[in-house]
């Protein structure tokens, strides 16, 4: 374990908890899903997110939460209580904030499951997400899958849109823009032959991860028919921080794809930006139709 990871329990209790966890979670490793969740001062949103995972109809799961140096007493209280109450939950505490990619990697290191899934601490899953998506992956024999998701405005407390995933997502498509919602993604370590970790970028680390996986498995299949997750948004409009993503996009092109500075800038300006704008336009149209259907 990295020296920055501090488990805030006495060593004796921690050893007991780990042994008890192994004994109590009688799961087939071939079916086990390790759910990766980073959190940082998530407060009141955290409890709903955790509940949406632990209440899944799919029984074989473990939830690995890495607290990325939270200072919020509400967040820490929720984590301590849920870890003591449910043996499927394992919490790693970091002594200061490192970023979501680093936090996810600490959980991935601890993961025991064949499948690795992701959910952030303010997002939610539908109750049957894992049951449906794992069955879909087995049917398709695919190593990477995702799904569509609903966009929920926390300020207004209502669904305001939908992001519809393409049926198939290739490496070539992903070079233009991230088309996989991290909160819906699952990858199969057995088919891929290993675990994959996120680059420790402050942003766009999920896109970088999926590019790495698609280099090997070639295609990601999207679950059809219905959304399987809820992305919780706290603002109506796109954050101004989106502008700062330019440097992280270029960093992904350079570090993951090995492009030089000029080629990375070219891809960003002439491939990413046009694709990103078209994606936003499509999402707006899909969301309008979704909200209108809901009445």
Residues covered by each model-derived region:
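Conserved nucleotide-sugar donor-binding catalytic segment
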Residues: 109, 164-248
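Glycine-rich, basic loop-to-helix element that forms the pyrophosphate-binding segment
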Residues: 94-111
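The conserved acidic donor/metal-binding loop of glycosyltransferases
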Residues: 120-124, 148
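Short, well-formed alpha-helical segments that are part of the catalytic scaffolds
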Residues: 42-55
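A conserved acidic beta->alpha catalytic loop
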Residues: 67-77, 96, 120
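Short loop->beta transition adjacent to catalytic acidic/histidine clusters or analogous donor-positioning motifs
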Residues: 31-33, 54-65, 86-90
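Short aromatic/hydrophobic "clamp" motif used to bind/position activated sugar donors
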Residues: 116
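Conserved donor NDP-sugar-binding/catalytic core segment of glycosyltransferases
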Residues: 128-159
